[in-house]
């Protein structure tokens, strides 16, 4: 997937880029189901709220096939490489599962 000039300009001016059609609704639903499967398993990479609700799943690309594919998918990787002008690799990957009305706040970040 190649970004157009306007998308590249927006990223450099505003610091973000939203690509709502990058993945199909079916692909998104598949990943949502994969995430639910990850949250249902008790493993050290899945951090939980005091209530037991999942908060974050770290490194899912290393133990889940769906998220492994996502982490290497050209529609995700190629636009980022285009923006940064160099090859990249997955350094950190997490899925935030903050349940509404449950758990601690998320700290501001960039």
Q: What label would you give each PLM region?
A:
Residues 1-14, 19-110:
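Non-heme Fe(II)-dependent double-stranded beta-helix
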């Amino acid at each position: 997937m190649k970004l157009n000039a306007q998308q590249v300009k927006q990223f450099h001016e505003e610091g973000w880029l939203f690509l709502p059609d990058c993945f199909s609704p079916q692909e998104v639903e598949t990943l949502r189901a994969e995430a639910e499967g990850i949250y249902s398993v008790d493993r050290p990479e899945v951090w939980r709220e005091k209530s037991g609700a999942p908060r974050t799943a770290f490194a899912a690309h290393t133990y889940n096939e769906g998220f492994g594919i996502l982490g290497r998918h050209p529609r995700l990787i190629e636009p980022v490489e285009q923006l940064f002008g160099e090859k990249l690799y997955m350094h950190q990957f997490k899925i935030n599962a903050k349940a509404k009305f449950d758990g601690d706040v998320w700290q501001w970040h960039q």
